[in-house]
Regions:
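Amphipathic alpha-helical interaction motifs in eukaryotic regulatory proteins
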Residues: 45-50, 66, 70, 94-97, ...
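Conserved small/polar residues in nucleotide/adenosyl-binding loops
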Residues: 193-200
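Short amphipathic alpha-helices and their capping/turn residues within compact interaction modules
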Residues: 53, 74, 101, 105, ...
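Alpha-helical bundle/repeat cores within regulatory domains of eukaryotic proteins
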Residues: 128-183
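Hydrophobic/aromatic-rich, well-ordered segments within soluble, folded domains that form packed cores
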Residues: 43, 47, 53-54, 104-120, ...
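Internal amphipathic alpha-helical repeat/solenoid segments
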Residues: 58-73, 89-103
Length: 204
């Protein structure tokens, strides 16, 4: 004889079908929101707001947008990177970055985790915005041997530039170890050989 109440979570079994139905409906709405976002990001966010899937305002709204972008596997990674790095979305970028845990990572590993989540935009200002936010988040985790937030910024930006230099077929003159070390003089450096062997992303 089946119990009237699910032992593990206390859910009334008579309510379970409606709960599952609501979960399916929510999943379908999130998928539709991702599809709309992939067509035009602003439309996707507006759709999610219309469906009451986002907090109404303030930091909670930015966090709910960031959570959607972080959790949805259907969101286009290129559009995601472009969206969070725009000047008008810096609050979403900050909340999105806060959803990563870089505590046990060196800078190169942390950057790799970040760049697996979305594609970096091509515009220098947008890359700088992401790098600044990353540096603030990473330095807040109190990494050993890192002297300042600025050092994280320079190092992270250099990793992006070096990765592009080493793995972009359009670059004819590759950066040497000496070039890389010269660019990072006085900054905590990541091994050139380590970066040469491991791309930050497959097609940065």
């Amino acid at each position: 004889r089946m119990a009237a109440r699910h032992e593990s979570d206390g859910t009334d079994e008579s309510e379970l079908p409606s709960t599952l139905r609501m979960q399916r409906e929510r999943k379908a709405l999130l998928a539709a929101g991702a599809a709309a976002f992939n067509h035009k990001p602003k439309d996707g966010i507006a759709y999610l707001a219309q469906q009451a899937l986002l907090a109404p305002s303030g930091r909670e709204r930015a966090r709910s947008i960031a959570r959607f972008l972080k959790d949805s596997p259907l969101v286009d990674k290129r559009l995601l990177g472009d969206y969070i790095s725009r000047a008008e979305n810096v609050d979403v970028l900050a909340e999105y970055m806060d959803m990563f845990d870089f505590g046990d990572c060196d800078v190169a590993e942390a950057m790799r985790a970040l760049c697996e989540a979305f594609r970096l935009p091509g515009e220098a200002q947008q890359i700088a915005r992401i790098t600044e936010t990353f540096a603030r988040k990473y330095f807040a985790s109190k990494p050993p041997g890192i002297r300042s937030e600025d050092a994280v910024y320079v190092l992270a930006y250099s990793i992006i530039m070096l990765n592009t230099d080493l793995h972009n077929p359009q670059v004819t003159r590759r950066m040497t170890t000496a070039d890389y070390q010269r660019n990072l003089r006085g900054v905590n450096a990541v091994s050139y050989t380590h970066l040469r062997a491991h791309e930050t992303r497959e097609d940065l």
